[in-house]
Amino acid sequence: MRKKRYVWLKSILVAILVFGSGVWINTSNGTNAQAATITQDTPINQIFTDTALAEKMKTVLGKTNVTDTVSQTDLDQVTTLQADRLGIKSIDGVEYLNNLTQINFSNNQLTDITPLKNLTKLVDILMNNNQIADITPLANLTNLTGLTLFNNQITDIDPLKNLTNLNRLELSSNTISDISALSGLTSLQQLSFGNQVTDLKPLANLTTLERLDISSNKVSDISVLAKLTNLESLIATNNQISDITPLGILTNLDELSLNGNQLKDIGTLASLTNLTDLDLANNQISNLAPLSGLTKLTELKLGANQISNISPLAGLTALTNLELNENQLEDISPISNLKNLTYLTLYFNNISDISPVSSLTKLQRLFFYNNKVSDVSSLANLTNINWLSAGHNQISDLTPLANLTRITQLGLNDQAWTNAPVNYKANVSIPNTVKNVTGALIAPATISDGGSYTEPDITWNLPSYTNEVSYTFSQPVTIGKGTTTFSGTVTQPLKAIFNVKFHVDGKETTKEVEAGNLLTEPAKPVKEGHTFVGWFDAQTGGTKWNFSTDKMPTNDINLYAQFSINSYTATFDNDGVTTSQTVDYQGLLQEPTAPTKEGYTFKGWYDAKTGGDKWDFATSKMPAKNITLYAQYSANSYTATFDVDGKSTTQAVDYQGLLKEPKAPTKAGYTFKGWYDEKTDGKKWDFATDKMPANDITLYAQFTKNPVAPPTTGGNTPPTTNNGGNTTPPSANIPGSDTSNTSTGNSASTTSTMNAYDPYNSKEASLPTTGDSDNALYLLLGLLAVGTAMALTKKARASK
């Protein structure tokens, strides 16, 4: 029995130890830094919870499965960790790799780097291209010499201020605006940062810097850089720099990039004679003279500026790469001496002569698309070319390119040129000049205006003049291993001489003019009573000829002198309200809408207020003077009907006239009240003041019944009679209409709203917080200890 009890006690103690050690591994992350160890073998995927990281650690630790267990000794063997581009989202578990000196978590999806905070043996960290914003966990890693964090979401770099052993720090493509934390990192030799920085003053003491990249910031003042005399490389692209004077002292520079700034004057660069790599693209530079002495240059980028003269480059014979694209170049002869060039860009310029490149036999890549080059015979000896881009030029003959057998990339599309003009005739024929690399003619793909092709000529039969004809070509070509489509459009202008006749009221003169030219304007003709308007392509109407811009068309034309007739004003007066029309002499007036006037009929427009002559808008013509026409009216007559109990008489009266009052009618037993505009009630007509309206009316005779005394019977009170003879019935009480006891006030509600206590919804009903959940472990351990003590006591008593 005692042995069984001992076995039971041992089992409990073992369970406590196993449970406790498991909890220690899972909770040690939140305790003291010294607890970042595991006390027993643990599966890899329990230490490194991120699936991708667990898979990587399985390989690093030499295991076959992520469920395999490892010890702290195993973890301590890991000193470097290359885990880039694995899609890792969490680095939990890395805190147990206490001997790490180098890590690479680049190109993952990290946001939290807390597990690194106590890995003080780290000397190099690469975590670019993640989503990291908080770098506080790096604050104590003072052994770091290299830190790469570009392309993250970092704003605050203050945690780096004590990392004084850093000699490489890469912080580009973040949201950093303040770099004051860097001022004490005087061991830095390589530095790049931010994209919102404006002030470079914190760099003043970093005199050991050799490579500095301040690209994509908002920097305009670079005066502090004059103190960094050890700089060998300065990259300052995409800023707001216009003055580079402070760079004149940095004579150790061998690489300088100022691409994408606001530079016009580059005179300071003349002193930087150690430069081998210079990028000045995307600025406003036109004068290259300061570069003439930079003879060590091997790479020079000058694209997208305002350069037309490249003669200062003629002596830079060490150049291997030269970019001159997107400028204003026509003459490229100075590059003929740059015989070490292997890479040359000339696209988007105005170059027609490419022959200066003929001596550049080391060229491997040549780009001159979007120029005006027609002759490529100078390229025949450039047999080292492997990339040729010559689209959008005027090339018609590919024969000179046949020997460029090393080409792998080729562009010859969209050529376009215009031939010299030929005289127009009904039948036009021109030779086809487009040849492929074998010298064979390439037949047209399309021909305008119904043209036809019989090798070697393209022919058009033109029934009427057209200013140009054209044809296109398109054929796949292969040169070396490069294949492209050689395509383009050829335009043939046509010119012709045509007659222009000038007509002045039947008289004409004739001149010959070449189509497309401006006409010489004749002297202005004169016509009595008219003003000369100009020359038009029709006797009336038409389009006026503009001698400054209109060019002779491709046919005979007639131009007519047109004159404007003097115009006059007709005023229409309607009782003082006027409108007007302007009409040419002898022109017809447009009849206005007939005006209206209450009670009147419009008679017409007259040349006098009263009387005068009526204007006939169909035949009367505008005289040679201004006129006024007056609206005249005649008053309308309306009928008044007098109705006496259905019998009527009438009167005809003009609008606003007074009616003659008829004799008062009589009616037995009644008294005549007057004439009203309604049979009953209505308004009584006042014959002294009321005027005839603009409509017929009816007036009704109204009477009042004479009063009659009724007999008195039975003591009843007779009904009263009103003035109109109507009996007024006695008032009647309406049943239920007594409102004397009705209250009109609002009754007070006997129900009140009470906020009763609700034990199920009360916020105070929940239990208070008792502390963190780790107390459960200690309660369990306590209970087990008490149980053990009780068992031991019982055992001791039993042994006595």
Swiss-Prot record:
It is found in: Secreted, Cell wall; Secreted. Disruption phenotype: Deletion of both inlA and inlB prevents bacterial uptake by human enterocyte-like cell line Caco-2. Deletion of inlA alone decreases host cell entry; the reduction varies from 98% to none depending on the cell line tested. LRR repeats lie at residues 77-98, 99-120, 121-142, 143-164, 165-186, 187-207, 208-229, 230-251, 252-273, 274-295, 296-317, 318-339, 340-361, 362-383, 384-405. SUPFAM superfamilies: E set domains, L domain-like. The modification Pentaglycyl murein peptidoglycan amidated threonine is found at T770. Changing T142S: In strain: F5782 / Serotype 4b and H4. InterPro entries: Cu-Rt/internalin_Ig-like, Ig_E-set, Inl_IR, InlA, InlB-like_B-rpt, Internalin_N, Leu-rich_rpt, Leu-rich_rpt_4. B- repeats lie at residues 518-587, 588-657, 658-706. Belongs to the internalin family. Consists of an N-terminal cap, a leucine-rich repeat domain (LRR), and an Ig-like interrepeat domain. Interacts with host (human) cadherin-1 (CDH1). The formation of the complex between inlA and cadherin-1 is calcium-dependent. Mutagenesis studies show it is possible to increase the affinity of InlA for CDH1 by rational engineering of InlA residues. This is Internalin A. It comes from Listeria monocytogenes serovar 1/2a (strain ATCC BAA-679 / EGD-e). The lineage of its organism: Bacteria, Bacillati, Bacillota, Bacilli, Bacillales.
